[in-house]
């Protein structure tokens, strides 16, 4: 069967339809159950991280290696021609695309990944995060984890907590879950870090229910997924960061009254917003969530690099 994601750029979660999402998640489940160590044996993939990353970069590169691909790239742009000699992003991507079969890219500038697609030719670009804009592969592993733990992606109650203004993970995840029916959203954030209006407008256009709340306790008994985020110090001025970082903290005692199968997720890194006593509860699922990044990213790489895929 023809693969609709072959050589497709994945810049925003909106580049993927509901059917595309289901295809990626089904492929991830198959790869988790049945590893394919030679699936990308003759492929070369560029891992281009213009911004610091631990989990995303290592997860992507592990995914590449476990599928048998060769990996080239950099984890810091400071020592590249772009960083040292002032080469443009356009020229950097134009050159790299002559070497490889796919480009995985993180960049601090919003829109940089979309710009890269204009210079990569037929080489697909996978966005590993562009500023506070989009982080589609994090969303894929989030969806995979939600589906794995809840058995579905529709008719869910999802609370998102913390930095909802700059947190690209919650923007992408909300857009993705809005492709499925019957989902209800609870947004819990300080006013300075509230969910952007364009996300709320999108939910209204799709007829999705949402509400704003001032504390986690208000919604604890109602939710299936509690998605925590950190306040991103690197995206705030020091005075603003100090004011808001401690406003929303989850402790084990806060989980009293939670639904039995409610799971706490977090894109990581965790700072102070989830205390370590939560880790020992059956609700904590953020480390398993991070582990699922391998399978979600393997699935996406396998699909964009194979015109037909049979697992």
Swiss-Prot record:
One of its GO terms (molecular function) is aspartate carbamoyltransferase activity. The lineage of its organism: Bacteria, Pseudomonadati, Pseudomonadota, Gammaproteobacteria, Enterobacterales. Pathway: Pyrimidine metabolism; UMP biosynthesis via de novo pathway; (S)-dihydroorotate from bicarbonate: step 2/3. It comes from Salmonella arizonae (strain ATCC BAA-731 / CDC346-86 / RSK2980). It comes from the Bacteria. Belongs to the aspartate/ornithine carbamoyltransferase superfamily. ATCase family. This is Aspartate carbamoyltransferase catalytic subunit. It is an enzyme of class 2 (transferase). Keywords: Pyrimidine biosynthesis, Transferase. PANTHER family: ASPARTATE CARBAMOYLTRANSFERASE, ORNITHINE CARBAMOYLTRANSFERASE, MITOCHONDRIAL. Carbamoyl phosphate binds at residues 55-56, 106, 135, 138, 268-269. Catalyzes the condensation of carbamoyl phosphate and aspartate to form carbamoyl aspartate and inorganic phosphate, the committed step in the de novo pyrimidine nucleotide biosynthesis pathway. GO terms for cellular component: cytosol. Pfam families: OTCace, OTCace_N.
């Amino acid at each position: 069967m023809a693969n609709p994601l072959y050589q497709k750029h994945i810049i925003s979660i909106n580049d993927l339809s509901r059917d595309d999402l289901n295809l990626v998640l089904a492929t991830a489940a198959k790869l988790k159950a049945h590893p394919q160590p030679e699936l990308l044996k003759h492929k070369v993939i560029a891992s281009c991280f213009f911004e610091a990353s631990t989990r995303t970069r290592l997860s992507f590169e592990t995914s590449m290696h476990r599928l048998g691909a060769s990996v080239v790239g950099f984890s810091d742009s400071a020592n590249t021609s772009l960083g040292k000699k002032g080469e443009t992003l356009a020229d950097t991507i134009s050159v790299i695309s002559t070497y490889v079969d796919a480009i995985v890219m993180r960049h601090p500038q919003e829109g940089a990944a979309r710009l890269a697609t204009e210079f990569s030719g037929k080489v697909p670009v996978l966005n590993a995060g562009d500023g506070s804009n989009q982080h589609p592969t994090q969303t894929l592993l989030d969806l995979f984890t939600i589906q794995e733990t809840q058995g579905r992606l529709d008719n869910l109650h999802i609370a998102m907590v913390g930095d909802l203004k700059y947190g690209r993970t919650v923007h992408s995840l909300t857009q993705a879950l809005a492709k499925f029916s019957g989902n209800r959203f609870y947004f819990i954030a300080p006013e300075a870090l509230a969910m952007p209006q364009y996300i709320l407008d999108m939910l209204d256009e799709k007829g999705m229910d949402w509400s704003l709340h001032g504390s986690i306790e208000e919604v604890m008994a109602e939710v299936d997924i509690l998605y925590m985020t950190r306040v991103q110090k690197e995206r705030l001025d020091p005075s603003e960061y100090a004011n808001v970082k401690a406003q929303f903290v989850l402790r084990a005692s806060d989980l009293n009254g939670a639904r039995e199968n409610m799971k706490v997720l977090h894109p990581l890194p965790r700072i102070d917003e989830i205390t370590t006593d939560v880790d020992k509860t059956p609700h904590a699922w953020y480390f398993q969530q991070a582990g699922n990044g391998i399978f979600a990213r393997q699935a996406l790489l396998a699909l964009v690099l194979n015109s037909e895929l049979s697992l």
